[in-house]
A protein has these predicted regions:
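Short alpha-helical functional segments enriched in proximate histidine and acidic residues
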Residues: 53, 89, 152, 156
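Surface-exposed helix-capping loop/turn segments at secondary-structure junctions
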Residues: 1-3, 56-61, 92-94, 157-165
């Protein structure tokens, strides 16, 4: 599970009758992973499996690989600046540096170009992207979290942006 590989398919068109191999099927999917090497390796394996499935039923398989989100690579130095400010505001017991998770975001793409940090803030409950996902702490969401970000910006820009230049 170190590579956090996830494969998300959806069949857009898959025939008209039960128990009949359709003459035409379209499927869209994407593969996510914690690093680019794993992403490429597992995508190759998935493509091989899709072709094998088509071969098994005498079908053809046309694949078109398109780029998706790159894995998120947060900058440790920038993360530490933000973490120190979060600890100052929320207290050590309320701040944790999480491990990689299986989510994906365009911030992953940005993280391959410049140093980034992607903080998660505990101000909501429910399943992320789910119908039951709701904000349950407005103070943290609208006041404290922006304050942590502002403090981080100040730290980065202080002393002619010395810290930002280091990062």
């Amino acid at each position: 599970e170190d590579d956090f590989v996830r494969f998300h398919p959806i069949i857009n068109s898959g025939g008209d009758l039960v128990n009949v191999i359709p003459d035409y099927v379209t499927m869209e999917s994407y593969t996510r992973a914690a690093n680019v090497d794993a992403l490429l390796r597992y995508n190759t394996d998935i493509n091989r499996a899709l072709r094998a499935g088509a071969d098994a039923v005498g079908a053809t398989c046309e694949l078109q690989d398109l780029p998706g989100y790159l894995p998120l690579r947060p900058d440790e130095n920038l993360r530490n600046v933000l973490r120190d400010n979060a600890v100052a505001l929320f207290g050590e017991e309320h701040v944790a540096v999480g491990a990689h998770n299986a989510g994906s975001t365009e911030m992953g793409d940005v993280s391959h170009l410049i140093p980034v940090v992607h903080p998660w803030v505990g101000c909501a409950k429910g399943v992320l992207h789910g119908a039951n996902f709701v904000l349950d702490n407005e103070e943290v969401a609208y006041e404290k979290s922006p304050e942590v970000l502002a403090m981080t910006i100040i730290d980065l820009l202080y002393d002619d942006a010395k810290k930002a230049e280091e990062i």
